[in-house]
Amino acid sequence: MSVALASEYQLVQNAQLPQRWSQSARKSLAILEATARKEATAQMEAAGGSFCGQFPVDPAFKVLSLEYSAPNPDIARAIRRVDSVPNPPLPSHVVAIQSTAVDADLSLAMGVSLTPGRHTSYLVDARALQQSNSAAVAARKADGDKWGPACDEMFRGCRCVTGQEVVFYTAVKEPAGEVEGGEGSLFKPSFDGPAFRPSWGELSGKATGVVACVLQVPIGKETDIICAEYDNLVSKGQFATVDRFGGDHTVNMTGNALIQNDGKAISKGYAVAHRARVTSNVYGKANDVSLQRLAETVWSVVEKRLSFMPAYRDLVITEQGKPFMLGATATNIISLTENQGVMLHLDTDDGVWTIILWFHRHSGIIAGGEFVLPSLGISFQPLDFTIVVFAANTIVHGTRPLQTTGKIIRWGSSHFLRFKDVNALAQLGAAYGVDELDAKQRDQLEEVDAANSKDGVGAARRVASCMAAERKAAIEAQKAACVRGVVMNPCTGRMPSLLFWQVWRKPPALAVRANAVAGKKRAAADVDFCGA
C-alpha cells in the first residue's frame, strides 16, 4: 500500500499541464496583450484611474474604505473611494512582468486566461516568499486571536491591488518534495543573490507554478445564479454556525463533512457542516441540487480563467472520493461569513486550491475588511464580485476587521476541499454503501437525540460513543483496503503544497530570433521579466 500510494503521490507532485505553447499562439497572445495594454492605459489616463466596477481606482492610493450602492436587490456596486492613503510599493521579492511575450508564455504554459490589458502578472522569489510567510505566521502568534499591532504592521506594508486582476507565479529548482521546517516553510529556495531580475536564461531548468490569482468577475448571469443560490441556502437554514478564533469569528458552514454526533469532528469544528444538511427542515434532493448548482457555477467561473483547475481536480480526487464532492468540483465544504474579519492563518488541512468570493447587499460604507496576502505583499478591498484563487495551505492569508455604516452587508464565501473528511466519507461509503450513507448518518443523529430526550445527556453520550467506535473501525478497515478519497503525501498525511509545474528547458525560439533582430534594448525588454 505505502509503495503504491507513494508512487501515486509522486505522479501528482510532478504533474504538468498539457503543453499549449506554440510560436503562433504565443505571438498572437503577446500582440493582443500589447494592444490591450495601450488601450487600457489610455482609458485609465482619461478616467483618472483604472476603471473597475463603477468607479476609477487610482493605483497611487491604498483604498481603506468604500461606499456601495444597491440599485437592484441582487448585488450592491462599489461607487466611490471614501478613504485612502498613499499606496506603498511592492516588496523587492515581487516583480511585475513587463514583457508581453513572457506574460504570454507563462499564460499559455500555466493555463491562466485573464483579461488582456486588464491584468498584471508577477514573479515571486521563492526564498523570500518562504521567509515572508514565516514572518506572517510569527505576527499572528504575537497578536494571538485578534488583529493587533504585528499584523497591522504587515498590512500597512502591503500594496493595494483593489479592482485589479493579478496573478502570481513562483519558481523552484525541484518541483517534487517539500522543505522540512516550521509553519509556512513549504517552498524550496530558488534564486540567489540580492538582485532579483529573473530572465528566461535564469528560469531554464527550473519549474514555475501559480501561487495566487485575483479575479474581477463582471456582473451577469453567472453571478446572478450564484447569489440566488446563496439566498436560497441561507433563507432555508442550510448553513450551520461555528465559532473560530476564540469566538471572534463566526462562520456559516455547509457541505459534505463527516458526521460526528459525539461532537468531535474529523476536521475539528466542521461537524456543523454535515449537521446543517441532515437536520435542515428542507434537507433532501432539492436542497442538495441547490448546493451543487452553487458549487459548480463558482467552479465554472474560475475554470474559464484558470484551466489548470479541472486537471487539479482529476489528479487529486479518486473514484471513491467523487461522490462526496459538490458536483463536478474539487469542493466539499462551503463557508459563508457576514461582515467578518479573520486572523492571518494557514489552512494546512485543506486541498491545494481554495476559492474565496465576495459580494455585497444593500447600501452603505465599509471601512477595513481588506483581504491580506502578506507574503505576496498585497491587500485589496473586494469590489462588486471579486474572487481570489490561491494555495491556502501554503500562503498565509486573512481579512482585516471591518466597520460598516448603513445596511451594507459584505458576504465572503470560501469553497474548499477538507480532504480528511473526503477520505473518511469515502471509507464509510465503501463500508456501508454510498447511497445509504446519508440515511444512516441521519438515523444516527436521530437516535442520539432520542436517547437524550428519554434518558438524558449521559445516555446520549454513550450511544454516540458506540457509534463513533463503529465508524472508526469501519474507516480503519477500509483504509487498510486502500480506499481513499484524495491522493495525499503518505508520509505527512497532507496534500502537496503546489501543483502543475512548467519546467523551462530553454528560452522560446521565437524570443531568441526577435532579440537577435531588435538589438540589446529590445532584447532586455522582451526577455527580462523586469523590462529594460
From Swiss-Prot:
Residue sites binding Fe cation per the record: H345, D347, H397
Highest taxon of source: Eukaryota
Localization terms from the record: Nucleus
Cofactor: how and how many bound: Binds 1 Fe(2+) ion per subunit.
Molecular function GO labels: dioxygenase activity; iron ion binding; methylcytosine to 5-glyceryl-methylcytosine dioxygenase activity
Keyword Oxidoreductase among record annotations: yes
The protein's required cofactors: Fe(2+)
Family: Belongs to the TET family.
Protein name: 5-methylcytosine-modifying enzyme 1
Source organism of this protein record: Chlamydomonas reinhardtii
